[in-house]
Regions:
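Acidic (Asp/Glu) and glycine-rich low-complexity loops/linkers
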Residues: 2, 21-50, 54-118, 122-135
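Bacterial N-terminal signal peptides
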Residues: 10-20
Length: 136
């Protein structure tokens, strides 16, 4: 009886672990086709990233945002400006356990005073960025 209990417990544990592994790796795989998308945004001075993306910020006279990556990921990006904050995110239901950062986003703005990084990826400040006060 004890052997059967150990056997069933081991089987249950194995199935649970396998199911957990499948759940972690869920989400769409990146396509091999790449695309670039330019976003029309209003001026901002803060960046909040909740997407699995690598961001490169360049200080410049114009405000622009451009993303490149797999053509099945880029259309899922949600890019908007609200209260002077550039917000970058993705549909949580489709990319709940998405851990890859195959998306690259180039951001240019004259002023930057706040950065919030909540997604997988990195934020790089390209060249020199002149700020009075920067909160990260």
């Amino acid at each position: 009886m004890r052997t059967k209990t150990i056997y069933f417990f081991s089987l249950f544990l194995t199935i649970t672990m396998m199911t957990g592994c499948f759940h972690i790796s869920s989400g769409p795989k990146p396509s091999k086709s790449k695309m670039t998308k330019k976003y029309s945004v209003t001026p901002f001075n803060k960046i909040e990233n909740k997407a699995p993306a690598n961001i490169v910020f360049t200080q410049g006279n114009v405000t622009k945002v451009e993303a490149d990556g797999p053509d099945n990921y880029i259309p899922q990006l949600i890019v908007m400006v609200k209260d002077s904050t550039l917000s970058i995110s993705m549909d949580k239901d489709k990319f709940k356990n998405f851990k890859s950062s195959k998306i690259n986003i180039s951001i240019t703005s004259p002023v930057l005073c706040n950065i919030k990084q909540r997604g997988v990826g990195s934020i790089y400040l390209k060249d020199s960025v002149k700020v009075t006060d920067l909160s990260i």
